[in-house]
Amino acid sequence: MSTQTHPLSGQELDVQQVINDIVDTKRLDILRAVNDLSLPTRRNEIADRAGTSRKTAKKHLSEFQDRGIIKTYRENIEPTAGGKVLLEAVDKCLQAIPIPRDEFAELTRTKIALTILSNLHREYQNAEEIQRKASISSTKQTVKHHLKWFDESDYNLADERGHTYRITDAGEEALIAYKELLVAAEQIIEKAEWLQRLPLENATVPVEKLADATVVASDTASPSDVLGAALRLCDLRVSRFRCICSIYNPVLFFAYKTMLDFGVEAEGILDWQSYIKADQNTFDFATHAKYEHYQPLYLEDSHTLGVGLYDDRRVAVGAYNEQGEGKHIAMIVSENPEIIEWAEGIYDSYREMANCPEENPPETSGSFDGRHW
């Protein structure tokens, strides 16, 4: 069973216990209310929708806040990308398992039940064999109690014949659904710093595919960590580079100019404020197409997302807090094909909104908001 240190709260979390805490309490109803209500919403509205007391809602919302599942601004509460994908992962599991929520809650309440079920096979085994393979310290009586529950429940997770037991189709389906939820929950915890900042409209990431992704996050003690990681990603060996940029940084821009000097085909989508700042510097390549193999584009709004696509083999996706002038940034770097495909989908959606400065020259007389790394 997986135990992880939460990067935001610093708590040591047993992931199986986290799953049970959600499905076995009002946490799930509160999480659903946060996601379903019109945004932003307030604590009392969430408590009413979840059918629970204000006190219980306050307690669970505080925990969600600490773990990056929701964000609050004054009295307003919204889910983060982490809160959205967590609810989706739990719902997917509950829809896939052949048992209702309360039975699933009982199954996940202790490690013993899950361990016993996962050590059943298609061949019949007696309780002693199951206990030995499961390597659990529980008594034979406890093992038999769980086996009897698996067999006698209305949902038939196991089949009994002559005091021997085997797993059923329903039991296998329950295990598969649980293991998928376990993987998703592990990644939601591990990538919490990034999911906390990822724009809600981009919370379509296949979280179970994030296992290979590394996370780099900046904070007050290490404000330049993400910038350093982005600089290290500058790769002269790629043949094509595409990016979305929402924070102006002349050092980063100059470093990536080297890729253009080496003939890398590139396209850059700058959000409005980044475009204005870069355009003020006539020596900055970012807004001026001084290379035949580079096309700058601009967006008419400000955004909080950055994407770098290095051919089709690596992607970096960074996001920052709406408050804090971009000083608190988290970025993932992944080579997983499904994460790359997801990021390409985001890039394409931004590209559809973008303008070509040669075809549609922007009005750049507006003021700059000072956001930078």
State where each predicted segment sits.
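Primarily the HKD phosphodiesterase
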Residues: 232-285
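A short, conserved structural fragment
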Residues: 65-75, 151-161
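Short capping segments at the starts of secondary-structure elements
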Residues: 25, 37-42, 120-126
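Short amphipathic alpha-helical interaction segments
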Residues: 51-65, 136-152
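Short alpha-helical segments that sit at the start of domains
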Residues: 3-28, 89-116, 145
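Basic, amphipathic "hinge/linker" alpha-helix immediately C-terminal to the N-terminal HTH DNA-binding motif
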Residues: 75-93, 159-182
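Amphipathic alpha-helical dimerization/coiled-coil segments
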Residues: 92-121, 180-242
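Amphipathic alpha-helical interface segments
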Residues: 309-310, 314-373
